[in-house]
């Protein structure tokens, strides 16, 4: 299903709630709403009164510092994972893509990049302006380069948030909420299947779109990824992982629209999707 339409809506829950449950749900919703509003206020204040009002070169430095600050906040538990997603999407939306392409040396990376023999996206670690290595502990800075038809196979993460900002070209993005972990499968619910271009950010966390799958649509597409690890360290998962958990979301969906996606190895994911 394309054109931005959601593949499936969340199922309706039963209407028999106790007043205590309803109160807890309302408090949780209000707390989350206040948290997002507070972070939007902080970001907008920074955009209006700090480096965002200065020449763009200073803007990229402040953008880098804000990325590091957001990573520190979510790792420390002072910012909820879903709030981090909205905050980094808001932050990226303030930047000029052409300037980021220059400051992140995208053209130089494209000249030197070594593509895998399989149709997988190539990955290059990069630096950020105005940041020393000590400033970037706990989060990554990566360029993903996709040839037409190459991909990052579908996978889930534990204890991680990340955001891919498209800098060049077109990328097909398929995302899924992670509903339940089984012994050798993950129950997922499709949320997005669409093609996006420069300026669009795709983020993920445990709470929203934990499973993603990217495929290059144009001859060359480039995304800038900011993964932040060791998030919510006390959380337990039904399926542990040291890194990516590769799955096959192409199996038929259940009657409720959800998919019981088998967990597969990385070589199996490469054979099937690349």
Language model features with spans:
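N-terminal secretory signal peptides and thylakoid transit peptides that target proteins
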Residues: 12-40
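Glycine- and acidic-residue-biased ligand/ion/polar-headgroup-sensing regions
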Residues: 159-177
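C-terminal segment of N-terminal export signals and the immediately downstream linker at the start
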Residues: 43-85
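His/acidic/aromatic-lined binding-pocket segments of jelly-roll/cupin-type domains
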Residues: 143, 161-165, 214
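A short glycine-rich, His/Asp/Glu-containing loop-to-beta-strand
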Residues: 118-148
């Amino acid at each position: 299903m394309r054109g931005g339409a959601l593949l499936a809506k969340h199922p309706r829950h039963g209407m028999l709630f106790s007043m205590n449950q309803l109160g807890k749900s309302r408090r949780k919703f209000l707390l989350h709403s206040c948290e997002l509003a507070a972070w939007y206020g902080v970001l907008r204040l920074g955009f209006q009164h700090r480096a965002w009002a200065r020449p763009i070169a200073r803007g990229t430095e402040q953008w880098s510092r804000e990325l590091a600050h957001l990573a520190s906040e979510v790792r420390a538990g002072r910012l909820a994972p879903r709030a981090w997603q909205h905050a980094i999407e808001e932050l990226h939306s303030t930047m000029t893509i052409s300037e980021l392409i220059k400051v992140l040396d995208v053209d130089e990376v494209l000249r030197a990049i070594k593509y895998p023999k399989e149709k997988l996206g190539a990955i290059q670690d990069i630096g950020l302006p105005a940041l020393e290595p000590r400033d970037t502990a706990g989060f990554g800075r990566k360029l993903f380069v996709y040839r037409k038809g190459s991909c990052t196979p579908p996978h889930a993460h534990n204890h991680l948030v990340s955001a891919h900002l498209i800098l060049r070209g077109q990328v097909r993005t398929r995302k899924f909420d992670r509903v339940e972990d089984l012994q050798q499968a993950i129950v997922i619910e499709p949320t997005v299947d669409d093609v996006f271009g420069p300026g669009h950010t795709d983020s993920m966390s445990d709470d929203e779109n934990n499973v993603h799958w990217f495929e290059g649509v144009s001859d060359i597409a480039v995304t800038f990824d900011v993964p932040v690890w060791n998030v919510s360290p006390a959380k337990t998962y039904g399926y542990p992982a040291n890194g990516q958990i590769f799955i096959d979301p192409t199996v038929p969906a259940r009657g409720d629209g959800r998919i019981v996606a088998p967990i597969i190895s990385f070589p199996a994911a490469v054979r099937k999707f690349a």
